[in-house]
Amino acid sequence: MNIEKGTETVKKGMAQMQKGGVIMDVTTPEQAKIAEKAGAVAVMALEKVPADIRAGGGVARMADPEVIKKIMDAVSIPVMAKARIGHFVEARILENLGVDYIDESEVLTPADEYYHIDKNKFTVPFVCGARNLGEALRRVGEGASMMRTKGEAGTGNVVEAVRHIRTVMDGIRKVQNLPDDELMTEAKNIGAPYDLIKQVKEEGRLPVVNFAAGGVATPADAALMMQLGADGVFVGSGIFKSGDPEKRAKSIVEATLNYDNYDVLADVSSGLGEAMVGINVSDLEEQERMQNRGW
């Protein structure tokens, strides 16, 4: 059977291949090699990790293509890169570079406060963040092949990622329990495409894989998110802002694979050195919360 490259089936299938794995933010080829050796299923190529983006302020944009190309040349695993929300030209540049996935990301400063990228027009698959079922299904309707919780990136605090995965799962359970004649009203209420609401009811899950992201900093955090229903884990600042990145990277991979084995979790949580310095999300002003970007 000949399946055309870039079809919805192919793009979603590529994302399915990452299930159960860890995707790590990297800023150099050396970091990318550490991530690959630790067992990461993919890396996210950036100029700065979210903690540094948050600390630096200003406008955060797509990484320099030269940075991305060097990381792509350094590893054999898939390489992702971020584009600003609504910035379809950045996305086209990333597609031209040959990245394996594009993250239309709230970690970068949005280019458009009203419209997200029409991801159906691209050959490359997209990943997007969501805080609830409606937001997730809107992104899938636009062509996202993979979802992740938004969490609160760059904080080292998993509380918002927990809130978002629980909210999505609660939304799915609600839809499953609705009679068919109430699905259209629910689609209207949460701003989601009706056909995707029907699919959620039938399948009992999102139409695409849903990873945890935003504040995952320890093996225990990764295991927690997996037990709450995530299909895999993104780790941003939590690895290379820690005391022993190589050991922590391996430990988070092991914890994600063995998320319900407490013997393994106790072992991989031991002797990791200092974790990244965290931020209490409650201390952030509303305008400092990256999760509020997009709709």
Swiss-Prot record:
Gene3D superfamilies in the cross-refs: Aldolase class I (3.20.20.70)
Pathway: Cofactor biosynthesis; pyridoxal 5'-phosphate biosynthesis
A family per Pfam: SOR_SNZ
Single GO biological process annotation from the record: pyridoxine biosynthetic process
Catalytic activity: aldehydo-D-ribose 5-phosphate + D-glyceraldehyde 3-phosphate + L-glutamine = pyridoxal 5'-phosphate + L-glutamate + phosphate + 3 H2O + H(+)
GO-annotated molecular function: pyridoxal 5'-phosphate synthase (glutamine hydrolysing) activity
Known EC number: 4.3.3.6
Enzyme class: lyase
Positions with a binding annotation for D-glyceraldehyde 3-phosphate: 166
Lyase as UniProt keyword: yes
Classification via InterPro entries: Aldolase_TIM, PdxS/SNZ, PdxS/SNZ_N, RibuloseP-bd_barrel
Keywords for the protein's UniProt record, in alphabetical order: Lyase, Pyridoxal phosphate, Schiff base
Amino-acid positions noted as binding D-ribose 5-phosphate in the UniProt annotation, renumbered to this chain: 25, 154, 215, 236-237
Domain of life: Bacteria
Active site (record annotation): 82 (schiff-base intermediate with d-ribose 5-phosphate)
Function: Catalyzes the formation of pyridoxal 5'-phosphate from ribose 5-phosphate (RBP), glyceraldehyde 3-phosphate (G3P) and ammonia. The ammonia is provided by the PdxT subunit. Can also use ribulose 5-phosphate and dihydroxyacetone phosphate as substrates, resulting from enzyme-catalyzed isomerization of RBP and G3P, respectively.
Protein family membership: Belongs to the PdxS/SNZ family.
Subunit structure: In the presence of PdxT, forms a dodecamer of heterodimers.
UniProt-recorded name of the protein: Pyridoxal 5'-phosphate synthase subunit PdxS
Organism for this UniProt entry: Natranaerobius thermophilus (strain ATCC BAA-1301 / DSM 18059 / JW/NM-WN-LF)
Lineage, opening ranks: Bacteria, Bacillati, Bacillota, Clostridia, Natranaerobiales
